[in-house]
Amino acid sequence: MVEPYSQQKQIQQVVYRILDANLDRAREGLRIIEEWCRFGLNSGQLAGECKYLRQEVAVWHTEELRAARDTAGDPGTDLSHPQEEQRSSIKALLQANFCRVEEALRVLEEYGKLYHPKMGQACKQMRYRVYSLETNLMGHQRHQLLRRSRLYLVTSPSESLLPTVEAALKGGLTLLQYRDKDTDDFVRLELATKLRQLCHSYGALFIINDRVDLALAVDADGVHLGQQDMPIATARQLLGPQRLIGRSTTNADEMQKAIAEGADYIGVGPVYETPTKIGKAAAGLGYVSYAAQHSSVPWFAIGGIDANNINDVIDAGAERVAVVRSLMQAEQPTLVTQYLISQLNRIKPES
């Protein structure tokens, strides 16, 4: 049945309004992402990709589509959701705007087929480019924060786990690893979810010890693997390129192997004997000095480091340290965090 001409025109105007609104939405979302790539990440490559996509979207924003706009008569302008009223972190802001762009492009892909034979395919291709951009940007963001992080807290089981972690985050901690070898998976999943939410609310990275499956389940920023854990290549296949993978190392051979296999960062130690590594001899400050001269990836000295010996570790060449007991057992985790970071910040930051 052929629709009357007047009805066809009415439907056409509705389609034009849908296209106009979603073209605006896609361009606005891309611009918000572009600004962070440009000013927050100082990445000309990522900002350039955003700009290219924004201009590709603009090609389809014709005068006849703009002319169909009816903001005053749009009931959607009064609709809102509480999640739209706040953003807890840069990551949340970026994810919200990536979703906005991707959804808009999906709408444009479908309704665009009614407007121009090539518009649907063009928007489909752009949508896949936005997916790739999101993966690259979030990975870039994580790597930048990893490089900026000086202090790394590795947790141990504690009844005050969450308050201690939050106190450290208040002190400026930007990197946390959840390590728990004994708790059952149900409790571990619950705690990991809460820790991830807590870390991300403070703009900190959240890493899971050993368990790639748990890291994926709670959307962690990465995983830390011991020498006896799965190969880095296997973990990378499961986690993808955007998440971080760390590896513990105790000597030069293990360090070089971890770097060659694609570790994003390494642990160097134990510097001193520690009860968290029972039966393992200390690697000593000599290994710290070796790592300072030979590691091509970010590395963290770890093992028995506290406020009393951190300057010895720094003097040996460490720019980053990981701690367990000195924070998990601290009476005032915020103050201890601030002190440790202040000592590490005396070192010239990595460019």
Swiss-Prot record:
Q: In which pathway does it act?
A: Cofactor biosynthesis; thiamine diphosphate biosynthesis; thiamine phosphate from 4-amino-2-methyl-5-diphosphomethylpyrimidine and 4-methyl-5-(2-phosphoethyl)-thiazole: step 1/1
Residues holding Mg(2+): D210, D229
Q: Which GO terms describe its biological process?
A: thiamine biosynthetic process; thiamine diphosphate biosynthetic process
- Catalysed reaction equations from the record: 2-[(2R,5Z)-2-carboxy-4-methylthiazol-5(2H)-ylidene]ethyl phosphate + 4-amino-2-methyl-5-(diphosphooxymethyl)pyrimidine + 2 H(+) = thiamine phosphate + CO2 + diphosphate; 2-(2-carboxy-4-methylthiazol-5-yl)ethyl phosphate + 4-amino-2-methyl-5-(diphosphooxymethyl)pyrimidine + 2 H(+) = thiamine phosphate + CO2 + diphosphate; 4-methyl-5-(2-phosphooxyethyl)-thiazole + 4-amino-2-methyl-5-(diphosphooxymethyl)pyrimidine + H(+) = thiamine phosphate + diphosphate
Q: Does the keyword GTP-binding apply?
A: no
Which keywords, in A-to-Z order, does the entry hold?
A: Magnesium, Metal-binding, Thiamine biosynthesis, Transferase
Q: What class of enzyme is it?
A: transferase
CDD domains linked to this entry? TMP_TenI
The GO terms this record gives for MF are: magnesium ion binding; thiamine-phosphate diphosphorylase activity
One GO CC term on file: cytoplasm
Write down the HAMAP family for this protein, in alphabetical order.
TMP_synthase, TMP_synthase_cyanobact
Give the protein name, as stated in the record. Answer: Thiamine-phosphate synthase
Its organism's taxonomic lineage begins at: Bacteria, Bacillati, Cyanobacteriota, Cyanophyceae, Nostocales
